[in-house]
Each structure stands twice: as structure tokens, then as C-alpha cells.
């Protein structure tokens, strides 16, 4: 008789079971309620199916809907599989590829037999998914050999799956999941016990888009079907409400209504800033300059185009070449027939980042340890060759400007420099009214440098956050294994906006690799050469994306100091035109960005129009206001108005129109 296995539960109690028993067996032994509620299990910390047999003593925690993070991920994963099964039932001959869960749902990529899918197909697919859920089909895991898997996929005409399976290691354990006895997919799992564990009213298919197989535009174009999935209808409804609110706040929509910027096909991924939008940019740029000047940074400007050999030396060519705009260093490089590239031409690249150029500035002249830290700042314009399908308004562009800085310092200065940056970022984000969380992204699997170097770099960032008093639950402190850059760990700032979304913006990274690769050095107190440590840091991330976040966070109602037009003097009657012009002159003299609206239109029409433009203050004047030297102030979003002397109104506006760092 086999020796019983000891399974330890979260409360410390131990259950003895026979080898081959499963978490589902233990759930049933505890009680029918738990057996029904259990969705999956954590065995020694690993999330597994309820039917996975025990082979040794283990720690067991049963996962139910109360474990929301795990339960949601399981549900979304299963919704993706049900989606694939439904599509193949409705559209025979469609090939399946892959479909992961996402932050708020799932998607699956398909190769349709006859035509690409469209949004019009979604209702029918949803209905078929609900049939599969209602059938309560058991989800069963099996381990297959690579040959068995390839044979199956070829037999079914699944060329994409067969291609993928053929590249898997021969000795890797490969798993498939059956849905009932008539449909299967290749998947690592885990999954829910059956399709009936999904709520048929807690998902919605949202859209269809194109996607290239393996993300390579040289490959076949697939149809990607997106969906959102939740544990119950209440969660789904709340999410859809958030989506509706997000649509109202969409920076592309508001940017058009407010006449801030536009994008067009002739310059994919590059922004055409209109006067009002560029004014916001200039205000942010001036604000950031004051902040970095006060923190001891020195502003620089570096070239847009550099020799490919520089990028090879820095390591970016090998890691990042596919995302760089590369051009031949040859004149002429184009004629009537098209591009000219000779075998003798060198290659140049538009910079995708500023860091190598800042190292080249540091290397000019001999540096002493007394000159460190040296903080170099640049509003650096960069270019990255992002796929067309990945571009999204201001949030994902090809040309962008970073509030980029690099701090060259000694080993003994790292913690204090990172701490100072943490405190600077804290002040800046609070000026914009954001709450945020801080994450420490730890070493990735593929990386430069030694283990000792990474140990030290991670410890320094952690210590700096602790010293700044930010490594607390209040600031959402969290460590993220595997999320660091290939050359350094990093701290990340995740802003929370008005509707609860998070945006990763600021970063700081300690880097010992690039100074080594580009031969940066300083003379130490001992008279010998030493390598500086390079701290890469940004607060806005990019001006484009930060402006997009601000527009959506404030729903276009920007703080008065950032509003392109801060006040409009609108007349009720033409008799007040001269008074309106005098009021405008006084507003401008006080440094307030103002305009007049003297059109022969009803005041309600003017109010509505300037509200759409998100003008913070409307100063309404008629014959009475002109005689008394007053204005009727109407604040954006409020129904009532308040009458006050013009001078008082100007004083009020001047206070709010002043940037927060300049207020007394």
C-alpha cells in the first residue's frame, strides 16, 4: 500500500491522502459548499487545475471567486478558449493561433478561411459562446509529445499551431486542454473545471482588429477578436460604465474639440500641434525647466542622427535595431528610381533614446570626482519605428520628446541621488493632483552584467525609496521580478487617474553597463580612473503621452495654469464691446491668457461653445457691468455665476493662472 501524502492547508491543518488524489478531492472532503466554489488550486504556490494529482507532500490553498486576481485571470483565460471554440463552430475552416488574458479581458487571433472578421460578427460569436458555457463542458488536461501535437495540428489543417509546436523543445512537457470530447487547444493552463463555471452574462466581445502572426508584418494578417471578461454581471456593468466614461475623456476626441492637435497618415505616429495644444506643451516645458534648474541639472541638446557604430557600441543596435529608423550616410541617397544604397555606405540612425549622446558629452574633457554628480537634462526628441497598428493618439507615437536626464555619479552618491529624484517626482506629481504607486522592476532573464552588479543596483534603489519614506502601502510599493531593463533595474511611477486607470510614466534606473561600453570615466580621489554610475531618469516620460494623460484625467478641464485660454470676456449686448476690450487688456496685462467674444449671438450660445472648448472662466458683461465696472463670472462646469468688480476677478484668475511652483 502506498504511503499517504501530507497536504497542509492554509490554517495549518494537515490532510492525509493517497497519491493521485487531487485538490478537488480535498475540497469535496471539506464540504459541498467549498467543492462547488473551488475554481483552481495553489500547490506549493503554483496555480494548477483542481484535477491535478498530488505526487508528493504539498502546501495547498484552494482558489475561489474571493481570490479575485487569480479567479479573474482564470476566467479570462477560459473566455479566450471558449471564444476560439465558438469561432471554429460558426466559421468552419478558421485556423486558431493564440489568445491570452489581458488586464481587463482577453483576445484571440484567428486566420479566417474566407474573409476577415468584422464587428458585425461579434453578436453571433457571443451567442455561440453562451451555448458552450451553458453546456458546462468539462475542461480536461492531457500531456502530449511534440510529435503527437504536430501530427494533430497538421491533421486538422492548423498550420499556425503546427509551426509553433515544431519549434518547441523536444523534451518540454506539452499540454493540451479538451473542452468536452470534441475540441482542444494547446495551452499551459491552468483552467477552470468546466465551461459552466463562467458567468454567461459577465463577458462582452468589444472589437475586431488586424494583427500579424507573431507580431511580424512580413507574416500573415490575422483577425484579432477582443473581449472583456469578469466574474459576474455587476463587475462587467461597472467596467462598461468605466469604458463609457473613458470614451468621453478620450484625448483624441477632446484634442479635436479643443483644437489642440491632430494626426494624419502623411506623418504616421507624429503629432501636428496646433497653437492651443503647443501652448500646453510650452507651459509644461517651462514648469519642468524650473524644476530641474532648482534641482541642480544642466540642460543640453544632442544630435538627432548618429552613426550606427555608436549604437553598436552602446548595445542598442543589437537589442533595438528593428525599432530604429536607419538611413544610409550617402549623398545623394535617392534619385528618380528610388533610394540609392552603395556597398560603401555607412549607416546612420535617428536616435530612439538620448542616453548614449549624454555619455558622449560626459566624456568631453577629464572629469574629477569633485565634479560629480553631474546631472545632464534634455528635452530630447526621439524616434522609434513602432508598427502602425500599435500607434494610439498621443499615447503611442513614433516621434516623441522626453523630459530626459542622466545623472553621472560616484558609487557613494547613488542612494542620495535616487532619493532626491524620488522627492522631486513626488512634488511634481502632487502639483498635478495625481496619486501614484512606486514599483521596483527587478532583473529580467536576458540581461547584461554580473549577478553581484544586479544585487547591488537593486538594493540601492530599494534603499533610496525607503529613505524617501515612499516604500509604504500608501504609495503602493511593490517589487516586480523580471520587469527591469536589460541593463539595469528601475523604479517606476504609476499614476492613478480620475477614473481609476493607472499610467506608468516616471522611471529611474541605475546603470553600470553603458558607462563601461562607452568608456566613460572620471579621476577619483586616488588619482586613478573610475567608472561613473549612470542614473537614467524621467518624470513625464514623454510630453506627448503626459499631455494625453492630463487631457483624459481632467476630461479636458485642465488646471487654469495649463488651459490654453484661461478666460473669455463675452458680451451680452454690443454696448458693452468697448468695456470688454478694456477688460481684455487688463487681463492680458496681468499675465492671463484671455480673449473676447463680441459676436452678435445669444449668451447661452456663447456659454455652450466656450464650455466645449473647456475655457475655465467666462466673464459675462452687459450694459450694467460696463457701467459698474464689474463682471459676471461663470466657472466651467457650474450653472450659477457670481458678480464681482473686475479688479477682484483679475486677482482671482491671476492666482489660479499661476503655475503651482510659482505660487507664494
Swiss-Prot record:
Cofactor names: Zn(2+)
UniProt entry tagged with the keyword Metal-binding: yes
Compartments where located: Cytoplasm
Annotated SMART domains: tRNA_SAD (SM00863)
Gene3D superfamilies documented for this protein: 3.10.20.30, 3.30.54.20, Anticodon-binding domain, Bira Bifunctional Protein, Domain 2, Threonyl-trna Synthetase, Chain A, domain 2
Keyword terms: Aminoacyl-tRNA synthetase, ATP-binding, Cytoplasm, Ligase, Metal-binding, Nucleotide-binding, Protein biosynthesis, RNA-binding, tRNA-binding, Zinc
Catalytic function, reaction form: tRNA(Thr) + L-threonine + ATP = L-threonyl-tRNA(Thr) + AMP + diphosphate + H(+)
Chain residues that bind Zn(2+): 355, 406, 536
Any matching Pfam family: tRNA_SAD
Entry EC number(s): 6.1.1.3
GO biological process terms, semicolon-separated: threonyl-tRNA aminoacylation
Main subcellular location: cytoplasm
Molecular function per GO: ATP binding; metal ion binding; threonine-tRNA ligase activity; tRNA binding
Region of interest (Catalytic), residue spans: 250-559
Cofactor annotation remark: Binds 1 zinc ion per subunit.
Described function: Catalyzes the attachment of threonine to tRNA(Thr) in a two-step reaction: L-threonine is first activated by ATP to form Thr-AMP and then transferred to the acceptor end of tRNA(Thr). Also edits incorrectly charged L-seryl-tRNA(Thr).
Family: Belongs to the class-II aminoacyl-tRNA synthetase family.
HAMAP family: Thr_tRNA_synth (MF_00184)
Complex and partners: Homodimer.
Full protein name: Threonine--tRNA ligase
Amino acid at each position: 500500500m502506498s504511503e499517504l501524502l501530507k497536504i497542509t492547508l492554509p490554517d495549518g491543518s494537515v490532510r492525509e491522502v493517497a497519491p493521485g488524489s487531487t485538490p478537488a478531492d480535498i475540497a469535496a472532503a471539506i464540504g459541498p459548499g467549498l467543492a462547488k466554489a473551488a475554481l483552481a488550486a495553489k500547490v506549493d504556490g503554483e496555480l494548477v487545475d483542481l484535477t491535478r494529482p498530488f505526487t508528493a507532500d504539498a502546501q495547498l490553498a484552494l482558489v475561489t471567486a474571493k481570490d479575485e486576481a487569480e479567479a479573474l485571470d482564470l476566467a479570462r483565460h477560459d473566455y479566450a478558449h471558449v471564444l476560439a471554440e465558438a469561432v471554429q463552430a460558426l466559421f468552419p475552416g478558421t485556423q486558431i493561433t493564440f489568445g491570452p488574458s489581458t488586464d481587463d479581458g482577453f483576445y484571440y487571433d484567428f486566420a479566417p478561411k474566407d474573409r476577415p472578421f468584422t464587428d458585425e460578427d461579434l453578436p453571433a460569436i457571443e451567442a455561440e459562446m453562451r451555448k458552450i458555457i451553458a453546456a458546462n463542458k468539462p475542461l480536461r488536461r492531457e500531456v502530449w509529445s511534440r510529435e503527437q501535437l504536430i501530427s494533430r495540428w497538421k491533421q486538422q489543417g492548423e498550420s499556425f499551431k503546427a509551426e509553433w509546436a515544431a519549434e518547441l523543445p523536444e523534451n518540454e512537457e506539452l499540454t493540451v486542454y479538451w473542452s468536452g470530447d470534441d475540441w482542444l487547444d494547446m495551452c499551459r493552463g491552468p483552467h477552470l473545471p468546466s465551461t459552466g463555471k463562467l458567468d454567461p452574462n459577465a463577458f462582452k466581445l468589444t472589437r475586431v482588429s488586424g494583427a500579424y502572426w507573431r507580431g511580424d508584418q512580413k507574416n500573415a494578417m490575422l483577425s484579432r477578436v477582443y473581449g472583456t471578461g469578469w466574474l459576474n454581471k455587476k463587475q462587467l456593468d461597472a467596467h462598461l460604465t468605466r469604458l463609457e466614461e473613458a470614451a468621453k475623456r478620450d484625448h483624441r476626441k477632446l484634442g479635436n474639440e479643443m483644437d489642440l492637435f491632430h494626426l494624419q497618415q502623411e506623418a504616421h505616429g507624429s503629432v501636428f500641434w496646433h497653437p492651443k495644444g503647443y501652448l500646453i506643451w510650452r507651459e509644461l516645458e517651462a514648469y519642468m525647466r524650473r524644476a530641474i534648474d532648482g534641482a541642480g541639472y544642466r540642460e543640453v541638446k544632442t544630435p538627432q542622427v548618429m552613426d550606427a557604430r555608436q549604437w553598436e557600441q552602446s548595445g542598442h543596435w543589437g537589442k533595438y535595431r528593428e525599432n530604429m529608423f536607419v538611413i544610409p550616410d550617402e549623398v545623394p541617397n535617392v534619385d528618380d528610381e528610388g533610394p540609392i544604397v552603395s556597398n560603401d555606405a555607412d549607416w546612420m540612425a535617428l536616435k530612439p533614446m538620448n542616453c548614449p549622446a549624454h555619455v558622449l558629452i560626459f566624456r568631453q574633457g577629464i572629469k574629477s570626482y569633485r565634479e560629480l554628480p553631474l546631472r545632464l537634462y534634455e528635452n530630447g526628441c526621439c524616434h522609434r519605428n513602432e508598427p502602425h497598428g500599435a500607434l494610439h493618439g498621443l499615447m503611442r507615437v513614433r516621434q516623441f520628446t522626453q523630459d530626459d536626464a542622466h545623472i553621472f555619479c560616484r558609487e557613494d552618491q547613488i542612494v542620495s541621488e535616487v532619493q532626491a529624484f524620488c522627492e522631486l517626482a513626488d512634488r511634481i506629481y502632487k502639483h498635478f493632483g495625481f496619486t501614484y504607486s512606486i514599483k521596483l522592476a527587478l532583473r529580467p532573464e536576458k540581461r547584461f552584467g554580473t549577478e553581484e552588479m544586479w544585487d547591488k543596483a537593486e538594493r540601492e534603489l530599494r534603499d533610496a525609496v525607503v529613505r524617501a519614506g515612499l516604500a509604504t502601502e500608501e504609495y503602493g510599493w511593490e517589487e516586480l521580478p523580471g520587469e527591469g531593463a536589460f541593463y539595469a533595474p528601475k523604479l517606476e511611477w504609476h499614476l492613478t487617474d480620475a477614473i481609476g486607470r493607472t499610467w506608468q510614466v516616471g522611471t529611474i534606473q541605475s546603470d553600470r553597463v553603458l558607462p563601461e561600453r562607452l568608456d566613460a570615466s572620471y579621476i577619483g580621489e586616488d588619482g586613478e580612473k573610475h567608472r561613473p554610475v549612470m542614473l537614467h531618469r524621467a518624470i513625464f516620460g514623454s510630453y506627448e503621452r503626459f499631455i494625453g494623460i492630463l487631457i483624459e484625467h481632467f476630461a479636458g478641464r485642465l488646471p487654469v495654469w495649463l488651459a490654453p485660454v484661461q478666460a473669455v470676456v463675452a458680451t451680452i449686448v454690443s454696448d458693452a464691446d468697448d468695456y470688454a476690450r478694456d477688460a481684455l487688456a487688463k487681463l492680458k496685462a496681468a499675465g492671463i491668457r484671455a480673449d473676447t467674444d463680441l459676436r452678435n449671438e445669444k449668451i447661452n450660445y456663447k456659454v455652450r461653445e466656450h464650455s466645449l472648448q473647456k475655457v475655465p472662466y467666462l466673464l459675462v458683461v452687459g450694459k450694467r457691468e460696463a457701467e459698474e465696472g464689474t463682471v459676471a463670472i461663470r466657472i466651467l462646469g457650474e450653472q450659477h455665476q457670481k458678480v464681482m468688480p473686475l479688479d477682484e476677478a483679475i486677482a482671482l484668475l491671476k492666482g489660479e493662472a499661476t503655475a503651482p511652483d510659482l505660487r507664494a
